[in-house]
Amino acid sequence: EDCRRQRQMCIRDRCQGYSEPGSGSDLASLKTKAEDKGDHFVVNGQKVWTSYADDCDMIFTLVRTGPQEPKHDGISFLLIDMDQPGVTTKPIKLISGKSPFCETFFDNAVVPKENLVSELNKGWDVAKRLLQHERNMIAGMGLGGAGSAKKKKDQAITSGMATMAKTYAGEEDGKLANSSLRQKIASFDINSHAFSLTMRRASEESKSSNSGPSPASSMFKYYGSESNKLRYELMLEAMGTKALGWEGEGFGPAELAITREWLRTKANSIEGGTSEVQLNIIAKRVLDLPQ
């Protein structure tokens, strides 16, 4: 019954309460605590970089319930109603001008015991699994796919980089005039196609074995993040001075959108686990290298 009810809660608009000030890459050091009060928990603490928390009505949250346990073993996974006294959010304005992230504060927020997912102090196992799914989603940004949450009107630009580059840099004999940029875009397209096929193969193998995401998701997340940053670097190189706009006349809406999205991509190698963390996971769990 609890599983059925929790699934229904997760269908609602929800956000993810993982990172905290001082607990980002070392997520297991989180300080937000949930005290057992019999039939409910009382939660106090702060989360940060909570995507769209100001528009959500539920947050799934990592909290510390076993302060005397080893840090990975004293964490629980709670579903918390955002529309209650003691839960507040504050949007964070990014360099891109957007505010998709928020700070989320818990001040004696009450959470029923039935909102505990899995077992008490076993939330880290749930969180790791969800992070693998998130990393696969973020990896899709390297392909300009749905995982990047781009609007359809922007996808036409980001998926036709060579065509767009010709518009700004000109063409000779049907080819992009700038030979250096042409080689960079060709290399990017080849690598993107190979990456797409690799992700598809891994997905099919995962479905056939019913094993779900694996540590290989860190490989995809790392490559996808770096690839998406490169995608926008190449577009800005092609646009030249048209990439310098922020607002006002002389720049089209699509040009301004690309410039702002380029700024946003700098977070790709941080969110969902930094590129450095992914490399450590790859070394340890995929390549089995000695520490």
Where are these regions (language model features)?
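Glycine-rich phosphate/pyrophosphate-binding beta-alpha loops
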Residues: 48-53, 95-96, 267-272
